[in-house]
């Protein structure tokens, strides 16, 4: 029995030696520990069997020298690397959910700190007007382009970069004069971009320091993220309600309850939608030709209103006010340095805009309710349809009243124009007349054959071609102009309606699909009023 135990110990020690060479000693020891207990005995023999692998290692190494040579040439480290690398990759690919939640909680707590929150704003929040300025080439890249125009690569060695920096000189940084100079340069660039957006720069040589792409101004109704200062310091989402180009600000109504409406500078407003840009070269081509510079202004002629607006006459507060007798005085009366009739029109304009804003709010709520019913596959009730139709009709009447009041306000503004040094301007109808004359000249030149006979002899067709050509010339003049207003669009709409009325009923659908819809898109693109160009012209003519 003792001899059998000795043979088992020697065989196990030999296996342990081979497994040690192959890097799997732990597996061999596990196999040895899993032997049946019936083969082990108590006392000294079991202790000897545990010590035999260390005693017999030298003898087994000498006896098995031929088998050990190929084993010694193998590298156990390499085999371990190959086997463990996939396990590490699988662990990285599937992170622990608890660890991720813990990191997210710590990050959220960090961003609650005022300094960390401001640091994130300064680092990543760029407004539409600042994004091309800060995300473009930095000062070092600009200096490289000016100092080394022939340098086409940016992959240089450290020695070559050191030589370039030595030639350029040491920059002056982190001084009060440097920061003041940078702030002034940024302020000037912002002002140049605003003037470009308003088409008020004629000399494009002043815009050499601006980026190649200039962002377009935001329009009313755009979803934005704006920064508030003061009590509510931070970034909040909202919607643009008004645009003030003179002060370079936006009137933003915020989504969060309690914030209300605030005036925010344009350099602290970021659009949530992808911002549109225009090449700076396109602004140079948008300058108005001298022959059209006096055409695109509202008329100075007197406006004969048919009826007075019911918004002021039937107002119980205004009818009982002691100021009513003063506000209905003669033409020469003034109040606070302004004509009385002008103040009346401004008050009417303010009330119409306030009422229209409430109607648009109700219309938005009804749209939300209708979309909710549609998502639930529920029918839209008759009461909702009636309220919706009533609101739409009220908005149409408000647009008509608003157009009349705008005519009156524009009339008073241009009566005050000579005192402010403004030059008198022609009516938009003059622009329309000039375009019609030019279209007739173009048609006369291109409709004549070499023999002197006309190409198109039908009079109705020649008139239609002339009117459509005049419409295109009118659109070109509006596109090349500067600031646009409702009177210019009204003249364009009047020309379109005249052409539409002269067409046969069988061709109206073709005219609407191929001409009218494209002109409407052009009007929407030219106007900076966005979706509010509905009341810029009288679009109530329907067939």
From Swiss-Prot:
GO cellular component: nucleoplasm; transcription repressor complex
Biological processes per GO annotation: DNA-templated transcription; regulation of cell cycle; regulation of transcription by RNA polymerase II
Stored SMART domains: DIRP (SM01135)
Keyword Signal: no
Keywords: Coiled coil, Nucleus
Entry-linked InterPro entries: DIRP, LIN-9/ALY1, LIN9_C
Region annotation Disordered: where it falls in the sequence: 21-82
Subcellular locations according to the entry: Nucleus
Coiled coil: 355-451
Residue stretches of biased makeup (Polar residues): 24-55
One Gene Ontology term of the molecular function aspect: DNA binding
Pfam families xrefs: DIRP, LIN9_C
Family (UniProt): Belongs to the lin-9 family.
Subunit architecture: Component of the DREAM complex.
Identification of the protein by name: Protein lin-9 homolog
Gene expressing this chain: lin9
């Amino acid at each position: 029995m003792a001899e059998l135990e000795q043979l088992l110990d020697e065989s196990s020690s030999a296996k342990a030696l081979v497994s040690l060479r192959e890097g799997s000693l732990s597996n061999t020891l596990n196999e040895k520990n899993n032997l049946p207990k019936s083969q082990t005995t108590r006392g000294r023999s079991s202790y000897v069997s545990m010590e035999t692998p260390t005693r017999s290692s030298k003898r087994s190494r000498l006896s098995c020298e031929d088998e050990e040579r190929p084993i010694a040439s193998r590298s156990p480290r390499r085999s371990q690397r190959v086997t463990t690398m996939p396990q590490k990759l699988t662990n990285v690919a599937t992170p622990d959910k608890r660890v991720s939640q813990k990191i997210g909680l710590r990050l959220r707590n960090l961003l609650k700190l005022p300094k960390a929150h401001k640091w994130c704003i300064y680092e990543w929040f760029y407004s539409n007007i600042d994004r091309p300025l800060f995300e473009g080439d930095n000062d070092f890249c600009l200096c490289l382009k000016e100092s080394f125009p022939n340098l086409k690569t940016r992959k240089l060695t450290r020695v070559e970069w050191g030589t370039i920096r030595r030639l350029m000189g040491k920059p002056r940084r982190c001084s009060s004069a440097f920061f003041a100079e940078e702030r002034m340069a940024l302020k000037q660039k912002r002002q140049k971009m605003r003037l470009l957006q308003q088409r008020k720069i004629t000399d494009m040589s002043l815009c050499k320091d601006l980026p190649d792409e200039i962002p377009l101004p935001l329009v009313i109704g755009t979803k934005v993220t704006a920064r508030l200062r003061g009590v509510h310091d931070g970034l909040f989402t909202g919607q643009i309600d008004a645009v003030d180009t003179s002060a370079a600000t936006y009137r933003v109504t915020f989504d969060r309850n309690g914030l209300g409406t605030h005036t925010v500078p344009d350099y602290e407003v970021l659009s949530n939608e992808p911002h549109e840009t225009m090449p700076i070269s396109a602004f140079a081509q948008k300058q108005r030709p001298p022959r059209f510079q006096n055409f695109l202004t509202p008329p100075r002629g007197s406006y004969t209103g048919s009826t007075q607006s019911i918004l002021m006459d039937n107002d119980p507060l205004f009818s009982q006010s002691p100021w009513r007798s003063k506000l209905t005085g003669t033409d020469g009366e003034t109040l606070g340095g302004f004509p009385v009739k002008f103040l009346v029109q401004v008050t009417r304009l303010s009330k119409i805009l306030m009422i229209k804003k409430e109607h648009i709010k109700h219309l938005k709520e009804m749209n939300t309710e209708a979309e909710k019913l549609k998502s639930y596959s529920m029918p839209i009730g008759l009461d909702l349809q009636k309220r919706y139709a009533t609101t739409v009709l009220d908005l149409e009447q408000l647009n008509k009243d608003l157009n009349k009041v705008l005519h009156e306000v524009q009339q008073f503004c241009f009566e005050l124009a000579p005192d402010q040094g403004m030059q008198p301007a022609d009516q938009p109808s003059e622009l329309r007349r000039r375009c019609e004359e030019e279209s007739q000249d173009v048609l006369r030149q291109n409709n004549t054959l070499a023999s002197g006979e006309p190409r198109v002899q039908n009079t109705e067709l020649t008139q239609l071609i002339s009117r459509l050509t005049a419409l295109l010339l009118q659109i070109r003049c509006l596109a090349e102009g500067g600031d646009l207003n409702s009177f210019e669009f009204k003249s364009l709409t009047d020309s379109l309606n005249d052409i539409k009325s002269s067409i046969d009923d069988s061709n109206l659908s073709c005219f609407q699909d191929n001409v009218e819809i494209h002109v409407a898109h052009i009007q929407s693109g030219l106007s900076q009023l966005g979706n509010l160009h509905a009341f810029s012209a009288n679009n109530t003519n329907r067939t």
